[in-house]
Amino acid sequence: VRTDIVPAELGHRAFYKLLTATVVPRPIAWVSTVSADGVVNLAPHSFFTVACVDPPMIQFTSVGVKDSLRNVRATGEFVVCLAPEPLFEQINATGTDFPPDVDEFAAVGLTPEPSATVAPPRVAESPVAFECRLHQALELGDSTVVIGRVQRAAIDADAFDRDPAQGGLPRIEALRPLARLGRDQWSTIGEVREISRIRYEDWPGHYSPTARPSSNP
């Protein structure tokens, strides 16, 4: 039995809460920007994903006009840092609705690290930073999708399983990314499963999963 819900009947705020409680888990873009007056801003945004592969682009969504969006529009630059589990409380603290003249790095005790290609700093304590220049800010209703072209990725060397020039990739246990759920809930990476995608030429002609879902809640 399912409950059918019509967004307009429930109301936009209640349906927003429903969306964020069911579109889960959501990776977090920890976005660093600089205002036109030179004030550094840092804020978490949980509507975040890869937007394009070639050229490499990532995107985050600002619900309403917040300092991150205002600064990106003014300067055309931002940095997205990974939000790691050890910085859980500081990441949450940067979501406080500080006035625009407050530097969140200083407010929560984080270290700004100079970026190589843009003015906004990286979070030194974060294992991953993507330096971006604005490609497009797309307005959708009450929100704005900010798409940035990645100029440089800075990743802790000890996070890699081997030399990235030889195909090495960061180990998930070294990154320990946080994700947002509904309400005031967050999640850690938890159990990691690995399975290869089936090529059509290897398709057996029938399909039967080896592990069937439990009927218990």
Residue ranges and their predicted role:
Residues 1-217:
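Basic, polyanion-binding surface patches
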